[in-house]
């Protein structure tokens, strides 16, 4: 069972009190993934938010420029970080794929259930969505840098 203490270590929940985290913990379930497991695929329906407890998960996108196709890792999620945030943001479509580098343990929350909970407590909802917007901004910056790097490699070929 996921504890409030574990959730406290994730930046998504920064600013929440122990009793609030305990309520959110009730929405959580745990899952283990094997090395190289594909957790989700770009373009799919985003139903769950993932919190990484152990391991590393590569966030990848596929792209094609003329006849050149490739899969680029645009971010590597580390312990204590979240991914699959599209489950909380319309249109709830996955903007990338997620693949485990090695074994990984994750905490999962159904996005719809979490949003229903956040609707009931506007303060908690505000705190989490504020933290989420900072995360999305950071990931967008990381993705831009990673794509520039991949395009530069392509141009040099």
List where the protein language model places each region.
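Cytosolic regulatory regions built on CNB/CRP/Popeye-like sensor folds
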Residues: 1-157
């Amino acid at each position: 069972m996921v504890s409030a203490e574990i959730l406290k270590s994730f930046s998504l929940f920064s600013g929440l009190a122990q009793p609030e985290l305990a309520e959110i913990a009730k929405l959580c379930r745990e899952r283990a993934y094997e090395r190289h497991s594909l957790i989700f695929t770009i373009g799919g329906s985003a139903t769950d938010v993932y919190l990484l407890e152990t391991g590393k998960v590569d966030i990848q996108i596929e792209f094609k420029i003329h006849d050149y196709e490739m899969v680029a890792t645009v971010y590597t999620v580390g312990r204590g970080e979240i991914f699959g945030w599209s489950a909380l943001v319309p249109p709830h479509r996955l903007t990338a794929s997620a693949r485990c580098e090695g074994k990984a343990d994750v905490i999962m929350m159904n996005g719809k259930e979490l949003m229903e909970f956040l609707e009931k407590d506007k303060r908690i909802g505000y705190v989490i969505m504020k933290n989420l917007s900072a995360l999305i901004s950071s990931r967008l910056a990381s993705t831009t840098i990673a794509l520039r790097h991949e395009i530069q490699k392509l141009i040099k070929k």
